[in-house]
C-alpha cells in the first residue's frame, strides 16, 4: 500500500483529431504544437483503443522512488479504497484544434450486452479555456430528430445534416457539462478541458472520415458491433435547447469546507469533481483522489510530506491518507460509487 501521494507524468494518447498545443503549454512545455496526441490521460488504468495497438498506451506514467513507472505497477487494489476492485474512473486533459467527430458512448447496459464491459462511458467536461470566443460543443438531439432520419443521414454521410440535428452550445471557462451514455455529442474546435469519465475507451462514431481526411475502419467506427448496433447506442429523446441546458449543464454548489462541488454523486454515480481555489482544504477520503493543479503556488501536505505545487501537476492520493491543500487552485477528482461493496 502507498503511504504518500505519487506524482503523475504526462501520458499522451493518440486520437483521430488534432490538438494539444494549449494543453502542452499548460503542462509547461515550451513551443508546443498541435499533433495527433491531444489528450493527457490521468489516473488511467485503461489502455487506449486505437487503430494500431500500442502496448500500455494510455496507462499513466508516474514518478516512484526516483524511477518512471506505470501506475498499474505501483498502485494496489487497497489504494483504491475499501470495497473497490478497480479505479472506477478515467480523467483526461483534452485540447481540440479540430472538431471531434460526431459520436456517442455506451450506457452501462449497452456496454455490458454488446462489449462485455463492466463500464459504459458517461463523462463530464470542465472547461479550462478556449481558443476562440465561439468555441462550442454539440449535445443532444433536437426536437425533429428520429432514428429513421438519423439513420438516413448516417447512410448518406451527410455531416452538415447530422450536425444540424444537434444543439450547439458556446462554452466558457468554468462550464460543467455532463454527457450521459447514449447522448449524441461532438466537441468543437478550440476547447481545452478536463474530462472525467467512466474507465473505458468505447466511442461509437457516425462520421466515417475524420475532419482531417482519415478514412476510419469499421473497428474504429463501431468495434465490430455493426451499424445497426451503432444506431442502437443513441438516445433518441428529443430535447429543446433549454432542456439540454437544464439536464446536462450543471450548476456548482459551495461545500462546507470552501470547495466548489462541480459534479456531485447526486448528479451521477460515475464520478465526482470539486474545485479548491485558495481556501485551506483537507480530508481523509475513503477512496483515492486525483489532484490536478490549475495554477502555480500553494502546497499540498500528504502524510507530513510537503509538495510545492506548479500548474499542470497531477497527483494520485491513495485512499485513507490525510492530505491538505494550502493557498492552491486545484481540481479534486473522485471515482464512482456505483456498485461499490460496503
Positions of the model-derived regions?
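A surface-exposed beta-alpha-beta supersecondary segment
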Residues: 270-277
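Transition-metal
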Residues: 1-146, 209-253, 273, 338-339
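Short acidic-glycine-tyrosine-enriched beta hairpin
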Residues: 166-178, 301-320
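Ligand-binding loop in jelly-roll beta-barrel domains
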Residues: 94-99, 107, 130-133, 183-202, ...
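Non-heme Fe(II)/2-oxoglutarate
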Residues: 189-192, 198-220, 253, 312
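Loop-centered beta-sheet repeat module
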Residues: 156-206
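Intrinsically disordered, low-complexity linker/loop segments enriched in Gly/Pro
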Residues: 124, 129-178
